UniProtKB/Swiss-Prot annotation:
One of its GO terms (cellular component) is trans-Golgi network. Keywords: GTP-binding, Lipoprotein, Myristate, Nucleotide-binding. Pfam families: Arf (PF00025). Binds and exchanges GTP and GDP. A lipid is attached at G2 (N-myristoyl glycine). GO terms for molecular function: GTP binding; GTPase activity. This is ADP-ribosylation factor-like protein 5B. GTP binds at residues 23-31, 66-70, 125-128, 159. The keyword Nucleotide-binding applies.
Amino acid sequence: MGLIFAKLWSLFCNQEHKVIIVGLDNAGKTTILYQFLMNEVVHTSPTIGSNVEEIVVKNTHFLMWDIGGQESLRSSWNTYYSNTEFIILVVDSIDRERLAITKEELYRMLAHEDLRKAAVLIFANKQDMKGCMTAAEISKYLTLSSIKDHPWHIQSCCALTGEGLCQGLEWMTSRIGVR
């Protein structure tokens, strides 16, 4: 009996949780993915298609899909939505001109049937840059308070230093099993 329980427990504990990392090009998605994985900055080039890595946090396994954010690739984001539990939206906090596009993409995703149960973590990236928008400013502009059907959290961060990233992952792990 104990062996059966142990096997079931190990299956439950090692369950992978699918995460998509999205955002406009040059927001810092790939840098964040590899900060999660290696805790260091790696040289990146624009992602064509996707990168996928498994990240383990406190025995919780996340399968993270970093999806290219160029305009020509955004129409294919929906091919990654199936079975997604978490959306990480990376926002470039200094790119005020394209925040309206980010907002459009966010609400397009939230309306998609395959993401109806997904929780949303918004990383307000590049907080180390002079003149950046605060997480509160981004939250207000994206009207995050109007999102009622999805749990969400906004977190200030700096992908280059890793500041704020652990807090975002902790929020995600706290959401496991909460629906």
